[in-house]
Amino acid sequence: MNTKTMKIIMMLLGNLLLGIAVAILRMSRFGTDPFTCMNLGVSGFLNISFGTYQLLVNIILFIFVLWKGRGCIGAGTIVNMAGIGYIADFGVFVLTKCLGQPEMLSMQIRILLMIFAVTMCSFAAAMYMEADMGIAPYDAFGVIIEKISNRKIPFKVARVLTDVICVAIGFSFGSIVGVATVITAFCMGCLLYTS
């Protein structure tokens, strides 16, 4: 298997696992990553599916990234922006059929789901970033802010700012903010910073 094929497999598998991890986090009810938190809150308020709303937001962000951060775009960008939300929606549907409504799950099950999902999320993100075939439009924002500020706002600060804004919006629209929100924000920020 050549390097290009391996990278494509890593990118596709990484994004698939990210979508599944988001679904499991939603089932745990301990919060999700900041971007998902925002999109869940607003999509619930507007009464449209999470997958559709996330795609619409990603298209808007993609236009900005195309203008200011073209180097961040690749096949992985398109797969991530179009796929994660719908994979997560389908995952929640399947998990609800298998486990029942999230509200009915015991605390122990929810904690196990959260631990498993956070671990999977970190592993999947590392896999899709290692493939180096583009990053999600939201993930590109920290890179772009650092670039257009001439490094006056470092990536880490930019990422914290965007995450805090997303969590604030999500919370104001009724999204669950919990321990998983903090953990995933920290893990994803570190992964992006070191990649």
Question: Which functions belong to the PLM regions below?
Answer:
Residues 117-143, 151, 160-166:
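Alpha-helical transmembrane segments of helical membrane proteins, especially in multi-pass transport
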Residues 19-20, 62-63, 86, 90, ...:
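Alpha-helical transmembrane segments of multipass membrane proteins
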Residues 37-47, 140-147:
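Short amphipathic alpha-helical coupling elements at transmembrane boundaries
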Residues 45-56:
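Structural signature of hydrophobic alpha-helical transmembrane segments
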Residues 193-194:
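Conserved small/polar residues in nucleotide/adenosyl-binding loops
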Residues 106, 110-111, 177-186:
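Loop-to-transmembrane alpha-helix initiation sites
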Residues 61-71:
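C-terminal ends of transmembrane helices
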